Amino acid sequence: MVGPAPRRRLRPLAALALVLALAPGLPTARAGQTPRPAERGPPVRLFTEEELARYGGEEEDQPIYLAVKGVVFDVTSGKEFYGRGAPYNALTGKDSTRGVAKMSLDPADLTHDTTGLTAKELEALDEVFTKVYKAKYPIVGYTARRILNEDGSPNLDFKPEDQPHFDIKDEF
């Protein structure tokens, strides 16, 4: 007796390689070009860890968000990759910077912490951040940690003028 064919899933690294291969064909803004106000989406917002966790792809009628480098992206259009039961669902609902840098879905790596990453991992992080997430998915906000220290004081390393889609007069 022959049963149903087993479901095949792309291995995480193979799928990431596929995404990177397709990335050059994705539409992107020209260097130095700021989107006109009419081209911008809704204003971005700050997300606490608890708020971001609500957007982990478990609810069918809710957007799916993930953060990389403190930037929160709406990855709902990639539901087949990030939705419930999908290969990269573990990255959603949190800042998964370390996991993206290491190309790892290990729960210990699904954190914002970049301490101890190698130069090669940091380079991979920047490439995926720019060529995949910034090029393909809308920015909906930032993690509060990116702008505020744990004690609530301002993060002096945060420079609004260096942030994609961050127009401080429109946001606060």
UniProtKB/Swiss-Prot annotation:
Acts as a neurotrophic factor in postnatal mature neurons enhancing neuronal survival. Promotes cell proliferation and neurogenesis in undifferentiated neural progenitor cells at the embryonic stage and inhibits differentiation of astrocytes. Its neurotrophic activity is exerted via MAPK1/ERK2, MAPK3/ERK1 and AKT1/AKT pathways. Neurotrophic activity is enhanced by binding to heme. Also acts as an anorexigenic neurotrophic factor that contributes to energy balance. InterPro entries: Cyt_B5-like_heme/steroid-bd, Cyt_B5-like_heme/steroid_sf, MAPR/NEUFC/NENF-like. It holds the Pfam family Cyt-b5. This is Neudesin. Residues 158-172 have a biased composition (Basic and acidic residues). Residues 151-172 are annotated as: Disordered. The keyword Transferase does not apply. Ubiquitously expressed with high expression in heart. Over-expressed in various tumors including carcinomas of the uterine cervix, lymphoma, colon, lung, skin and leukemia, as well as carcinoma of the breast. The cytochrome b5 heme-binding domain was proven to bind heme, although it lacks the conserved iron-binding His residue at position 82. It comes from the Eukaryota. Belongs to the cytochrome b5 family. MAPR subfamily. One of its GO terms (molecular function) is growth factor activity. Induction: Up-regulated in immortal cells. Induced in estrogen receptor positive breast cancer expressing progesterone receptor. The modification N6-acetyllysine is found at K136. SUPFAM superfamilies: Cytochrome b5-like heme/steroid binding domain. It is found in: Secreted, Extracellular space; Mitochondrion; Endoplasmic reticulum. Non-classical progesterone receptors involved in extranuclear signaling are classified in 2 groups: the class II progestin and adipoQ receptor (PAQR) family (also called mPRs) (PAQR5, PAQR6, PAQR7, PAQR8 and PAQR9) and the b5-like heme/steroid-binding protein family (also called MAPRs) (PGRMC1, PGRMC2, NENF and CYB5D2). Residues 44-129 form the Cytochrome b5 heme-binding domain. GO terms for biological process: MAPK cascade; negative regulation of appetite; positive regulation of MAPK cascade. GO terms for cellular component: endomembrane system; endoplasmic reticulum; extracellular space; membrane; mitochondrion. Keywords: Acetylation, Endoplasmic reticulum, Heme, Iron, Metal-binding, Mitochondrion, Secreted, Signal. Interacts with PINK1 and PARK7. Residues 1-31 form the signal peptide.
